[in-house]
Each structure stands twice: as structure tokens, then as C-alpha cells.
Amino acid sequence: MRKLVFGLFVLAASVAPAAAQDAASGEQVFKQCLVCHSIGPGAKNKVGPVLNGLFGRHSGTIEGFAYSDANKNSGITWTEEVFREYIRDPKAKIPGTKMIFAGVKDEQKVSDLIAYIKQFNADGSKK
């Protein structure tokens, strides 16, 4: 009986929904990104590229930004899952990237950050 209960517990935990995304909390997480990136109306490239319309875009394609060859040639299209992998450890996902950032390790913060970034169209307007 204990094995059955334990098995059901493990099964329930493995199918638990992903962390809910909270754009307002994501805006707070994004504050650590503001040193290098901008987003929203009037956003401009800084040390890092503008992040408007990130999801669905190919890596290394924002006009006017000097990407590393690693980013330009990565073949990545930004999806939520690819971004999760990248933001946890940028240099592991794209070896040779110029992004100097240790990564966001907290899964809830990553989910919230995604929710915040997803709000913005390529022109910086909110969806």
C-alpha cells in the first residue's frame, strides 16, 4: 500500500502544471536586464539588443546590433523553451555569445520574465 501511495504521489508531482506566469513579477525580474537590454515603445539597442518581439524571432537578427558570430550562426528561433535554456546559462546554450550574465536559475522568475517579454510586439507596443 505504501508503494502505491508513493507511486501516486510521484505521478502527481510529475504531471503538475508548470509555474504560472506573472508579467508584473516578470517586470521586476527584467530590472536586472535593463543594464544591457531595453523593451517597449522607444526601445533602443544598448550593450544587448532590443527584446521587443523576441519570441518567434531568429537569434542575431535585430538590425543595428553587432551580434557575435555565435549568436548570428546559432540557428536558434526564440521559443519559450529555448529562452528558458538560454537565460539559465547563456554561455552553455550559445557558446561564444557576448552576453555576460550568470543566468536566472529560479524557475518561477524565468516564467515571470517570459510573461513580461511576451507582452511586447516587435514595434514595442503591448499585445
Swiss-Prot record:
Transmembrane segments: none
Record-listed heme c binding positions: 33, 36-37, 99
GO MF, one annotated term: electron transfer activity
A biological process from GO: photosynthesis
InterPro entries xrefs: Cyt_c-like_dom, Cyt_c-like_dom_sf, Cyt_c_1A/1B
SUPFAM superfamilies: Cytochrome c (SSF46626)
Residues where Pyrrolidone carboxylic acid is found: 21
Keywords: Electron transport, Heme, Iron, Metal-binding, Photosynthesis, Pyrrolidone carboxylic acid, Signal, Transport
Pfam family membership, one: Cytochrom_C
Signal sequence region: 1-20
Domain of life of the native organism: Bacteria
Free-text description of this protein's post-translational modifications in UniProt: Binds 1 heme c group covalently per subunit.
Protein family per UniProt: Belongs to the cytochrome c family.
Biological function: Cytochrome c2 is found mainly in purple, non-sulfur, photosynthetic bacteria where it functions as the electron donor to the oxidized bacteriochlorophyll in the photophosphorylation pathway. However, it may also have a role in the respiratory chain and is found in some non-photosynthetic bacteria.
Protein name (database record): Cytochrome c2
